[in-house]
UniProtKB/Swiss-Prot annotation:
GO terms for cellular component: cytoplasm. It is an enzyme of class 4 (lyase). It comes from Zingiber zerumbet. The keyword Hydrolase does not apply. The Asp-Asp-Xaa-Xaa-Asp/Glu (DDXXD/E) motif is important for the catalytic activity, presumably through binding to Mg(2+). Binds 3 Mg(2+) or Mn(2+) ions per subunit. The gene is ZSS2. This is Beta-eudesmol synthase.
Amino acid sequence: MEKQSLTFDGDEEAKIDRKSSKYHPSIWGDYFIQNSSLTHAKESTQRMIKRVEELKVQVKSMFKDTSDLLQLMNLINSIQMLGLDYHFENEIDEALRLIYEVDDKSYGLYETSLRFQLLRQHGYHVSADIFNKFKDDNGSFISSLNGDAKGLLSLYNVSYLGTHGETILDEAKSFTKPQLVSLMSELEQSLAAQVSLFLELPLCRRNKILLARKYILIYQEDAMRNNVILELAKLNFNLLQSLYQEELKKISIWWNDLAFAKSLSFTRDRVVEGYYWVLTIYFEPQHSRARVICSKVFAFLSIMDDIYDNYGILEECTLLTEAIKRWNPQAIDGLPEYLKDYYLKLLKTFEEFEDELELNEKYRMLYLQDEVKALAISYLQEAKWGIERHVPSLDEHLHNSLISSGSSTVICASFVGMGEVATKEVFDWLSSFPKVVEACCVIGRLLNDIRSHELEQGRDHTASTVESYMKEHDTNVDVACEKLREIVEKAWKDLNNESLNPTKVPRLMIERIVNLSKSNEEIYKYNDTYTNSDTTMKDNISLVLVESCDYFNK
């Protein structure tokens, strides 16, 4: 017997107590579809590509011609911060092997910190004990370091690369920050700009494409800049930006065709912001297919979140969960009309992904389906908690909400469109919820809750981890947020540890997970800038996706 769809007449609908909040509309609209001035002319693009190849040859020669290891370290550091390192992976790997073997006992603070940073960033096991030489007999950092702004900044940045038990890096963090703040007014422009940038968010927690865009502006004012590298950075960024604009135009047209902004008007219309979030996971051109697939998945997940969290009643959410678990078009029986539309388009989009994948890649969609099913189940649990006014313990909350953070689903989606490196073994590893994925989920969940707490409680939202901690420890919101931030820092140490060689899966895959954690730090730095996107999110999107670099000023 066919199930009857869950429908309500006008009077019944009016009586339903929905939690719906008003989100501001898309601030971008059709900008990336209609603005023809965004992309460069074909002839201009070809000239830029030709010039980039010429400049790359010159930079590769720099690696060969540089015998001084400090100059080599500075070269690698500049290339990485300018977003050029994917062009020079072999040269950097070879240089790091030399740098690893060097005896750094005679190095000063800057050189020691830079060496440690570069090696840790690439998974080398280097001991933090090397920084003990900068301490006095009382265990304090020596006072002669206080005026060394460049060295202090480098030490400050590496202090965030620590793993559990490396207390000297925790001490370095506490020591360097006030010193750098006090020196700010005395520094030359380029160094002051770097200090300001990294005090806001340290180097190892910045997403690479936004860092590249911001660092270009700093580097061009540096008296010690290399003009070949600067020109390459600007041209390379503009070429990447053109690619991103093409991707976003296609995604925006796809989004408009789905028409969710009209049929599901209670949801956040954030397809541009979602694309930017995915872009921070992998900005390199070879990941174009993966970015587009992941961005489309992200758009569907954002809607799903709003259905469970902001609009659907418990009966509707239960029906949607059962339909998602079945993953079959026939499962729409019983769904209200607005959910039928969403559900069928979800299934159709996943079929399109499968068609796009190679024959030996199609199995990946089964893993992604399982992730979406787990996400729906976790959303339903939170919906039930909200109805019951249940405030779970922190452990009970995290057992469910690490999944509802969506981070593990986004990670899986980010792997689907990648190349041969994304093997079945990688997906099996991912589905086991390894430590590095758990840490990423902790960071995403807790940062979201810390920044969204006041807004969400003001609209009768399910208890967050902030409420769970407050109830369990009988404390106030400020203490709860401080303690949750400490848990975030522990999760970062887990991430740092899991990033050291040898990694359990190819390093490229670990980096996707770390990059998602970095983007969570940026997006939830001051508030939920995805939901409230007319903030720093808008500024950052403009920098990366709209404003090109003036590469004629070398």
